[in-house]
Curated annotation (Swiss-Prot):
GO biological process: acetate metabolic process
EC number: 2.7.2.7
Entry keyword annotation includes Nucleotide-binding: yes
Transmembrane segments: none
One GO CC annotation: cytoplasm
Swiss-Prot/TrEMBL catalytic activity: butanoate + ATP = butanoyl phosphate + ADP
Family in the record: Belongs to the acetokinase family.
Organism for this UniProt entry: Bacillus mycoides (strain KBAB4) (Bacillus weihenstephanensis)
PANTHER family: ACETATE KINASE, BUTYRATE KINASE 2-RELATED
Cellular localisation: Cytoplasm
Keyword set, alphabetical order: ATP-binding, Cytoplasm, Kinase, Nucleotide-binding, Transferase
Any Pfam family hit: Acetate_kinase
Gene (UniProt): buk
Annotated NCBIfam families: butyr_kinase, PRK03011.1-5
Protein name: Probable butyrate kinase
């Protein structure tokens, strides 16, 4: 089998994770920490790309990586327009939306830009894979009870789809042939209904929908939320933080550290026990609801993300959902590996690269 060498780039707010892979095998994985003062010199996140590019090239050189031997560069997908899942070739339309922050400004927007800037000089392809804006929801799943307020698909697409493919391999099937319920449990929690390779419904794990998590409130009583918003006691930003960042375990027990909470549970703390069980209860409830989306025809339930390392949490969830389908646990997440595998599927011609095309306010994927 021929070897494809792939450079993978995953930019964060103050760091850039890079990896070099020979097919699926990691040759180099490193987290480049950026000086906060250096980052602070740039007014816009997008202005950092040249600085980060040079830093990446310096690190590769220091490890003896000959970039002329690369076959492709793959970056973390940013805040683009809603698109279906898959591996996309970085093109001019995508670069424009990333640079202009069409759906928001975030460090992940640099992923596609950095991939393109490095790849174009080497005359090799640049890709992104399954960005957070992946949207494959069916029309019926978008409807809410208020006109003009559609449900949105915002979830851990990269890890959910990567783990779903691994489980499909373990079951000796193609991802596109299975119905899976995949639950990513980290700072936020999302439960995706994967129908034959498409995530046809998923809770919005960012903006207050689904189970509460270490840092996010999830679904809350809306009437009480409205009363709180108009009580005159809180600014808008404070309310947003109650939903994202200071919600969930942070609000209920004062920490986002699930390990600490689990230690409290093991010591018999009644409040911690109730709250931790409540989080598992809400995850199980979301899984149960998602099973109805797939008419109860489920090949497997998958638990992944950092919280899937918690035996207490996993056992509580299993106890409530094992009757629906077998529960498979893949703890943690490996975004660099997932990005490399997405690029590799295209290089091996196992799937065609998709094209990001903007037409009259909408984006279509062609591939």
């Amino acid at each position: 089998m021929s070897v494809n060498r792939i450079l993978v780039i995953n930019p964060g707010s103050t760091s850039t994770k890079i990896g070099v892979f020979d097919n699926e095998r990691p040759v180099l994985e490193e987290t480049i920490r950026h000086d906060v003062e250096q980052i602070g010199k740039y007014k816009r996140i997008i202005d950092q790309y040249e600085f980060r590019k040079e830093t990446i090239l310096e690190v590769l050189h220091s490890h003896g990586i000959n970039i002329s031997k690369l076959n492709a560069v793959c970056g973390r997908g940013g805040l683009l327009r809603p698109i279906e899942g898959g591996t996309y070739t970085v093109n001019d339309a995508m670069l424009e939306d990333l640079k202009n922050g069409f759906s928001g400004h975030h460090a992940s927007n640099l992923g596609g830009i950095l991939a393109y800037e490095i790849a174009s000089g080497l005359n090799i392809p640049a890709f992104i894979v399954d960005p957070v804006v992946v949207d494959e929801m069916e029309p019926i799943a978008r409807i809410s009870g208020i006109a003009g307020m559609e449900r949105k698909s915002i979830f851990h697409a990269l890890n959910q789809k990567a783990v779903a493919r691994k489980v499909a391999d373990e079951l000796n099937h193609k991802y596109e042939d299975l119905n899976l319920l995949v639950t990513h449990m980290g700072g936020g929690i999302t439960v995706g209904a994967h129908k034959k390779g498409k995530v046809i419904d998923v809770n919005n794990g960012l903006n207050g929908e689904g189970p509460f998590s270490p840092e996010r409130a999830g679904t809350v009583p809306v009437g009480q939320l409205v009363e709180m918003c108009f009580s005159g006691e809180y600014y808008r930003d404070e309310m947003v933080k109650k939903l994202v960042g200071q919600g969930g375990l942070v609000s209920l027990i004062g920490t986002n550290d699930a390990i600490k909470v689990e230690q409290m549970v093991e010591k018999g703390d009644p409040e911690a026990t109730l709250i931790y069980k409540a989080m598992a209860y809400q995850v199980a409830k979301e899984i149960g609801g998602a099973s109805a989306v797939l008419h109860g025809k489920i090949d497997a339930i998958v638990l992944t993300g950092g919280l899937a390392y918690s035996k207490i949490l996993v056992d509580e969830i299993k106890e409530r959902v094992h009757w629906i389908a077998d529960v498979i646990v893949h703890p943690g997440e490996d975004e660099l590996q997932a990005l490399a595998e997405g690029a590799l599927r295209v290089l091996r011609e196992e799937e065609a690269p998709k094209e990001y095309i903007v037409r009259e306010k909408q984006t279509v994927a062609r591939g």
